[in-house]
Amino acid sequence: MCGRYYFDESIDISKILQILEKKYNQDTLDLLSTGEIFPSNISLVFANNDYQLMKWGYSLNKRNLINTRIETIRDTDIYRNDYQNHKCVIIASGFYEWDRHKRRHYITTSDNIIYFAGIYQ
């Protein structure tokens, strides 16, 4: 996964917000990040057949882990159980990748919506 992604606030998520408003108070909803999303931001995910707000990343010894390899995820203690039992979908408009010259490139689709596979604690 990328190190940053983008959630465009112009995406029509009004129906999703109606669902979230029933679950969370306004102070919690205000934590939802839009625009450029960084690790540890609160973001919109779909898990357990419901929309939820979750912090991006795994906290481990004051570090925030955001990536793993599919080839080793089943063998890594911190991810093993969650890979089996806590899958989610991360909703985004696009994501950023950097080239070897540290230039940022924005990658998106024609309809400005991308779904990433994720796991959560």
Residue spans for each PLM region:
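Short linear sequence motif anchored by a di-proline
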Residues: 1-121
